[in-house]
UniProtKB/Swiss-Prot annotation:
UniProt KW keywords: Ribonucleoprotein, Ribosomal protein
Any matching Pfam family: Ribosomal_S8e
Subunit structure, interactors included: Part of the 30S ribosomal subunit.
Composition-biased stretches (Basic residues): 7-26
Compositionally biased intervals (Basic and acidic residues): 27-36
Positions of disulphide bridges: none
Name by which UniProt lists this protein: Small ribosomal subunit protein eS8
Provenance organism: Haloquadratum walsbyi (strain DSM 16790 / HBSQ001)
Taxonomy of the source species: Archaea, Methanobacteriati, Methanobacteriota, Stenosarchaea group, Halobacteria
Length: 125
């Protein structure tokens, strides 16, 4: 697991010595990397009594177009500024451009955190 604690190096490059051991709440998880496929979800215990629903894969998006929100089917990922390799792997992240049955749309939600894909239809599609 990834350590989300502070860096082991100072600003100058010198080593910082550990004051305490790594704690469980400082650990992170691997990213969900939501793909375009049949819907699959994972429930994760969050801090407190909360739960997070991660979308491991989905093919449905809530697409908004001038106030109207419709449920559209995702066909594939057209562009993803987070990582160029995500395009050919069909991974959906916030800011990705997806091809839907209504046209191209930009993802506004974080599917790995919220478990759903919300998007805004692009003008030029």
């Amino acid at each position: 697991m990834k350590d989300q604690g502070r860096s082991t190096r100072k600003r100058t490059g010198g080593r910082l010595h550990d004051v305490s051991k790594k704690k469980r709440h400082q650990l992170g998880r691997e990213p969900a990397e939501t793909t375009v496929d049949d819907p699959r979800f994972q429930v994760i215990d969050a801090r407190g009594s909360d739960d997070k629903l991660r979308a491991l894969s989905t093919n449905i998006a809530q697409v908004a177009d001038s106030g109207e929100v419709t449920t559209e089917e995702i066909e594939n990922v057209v562009d993803n500024p987070a990582n160029v390799n995500y395009i050919r792997r069909n991974i959906i992240t916030k800011g990705a451009i997806i091809e839907t049955s209504a046209g191209q749309a930009r993802v506004t939600s974080r599917p790995g955190q919220t478990g759903q894909v919300s998007a805004v239809l692009l003008e030029d599609s």
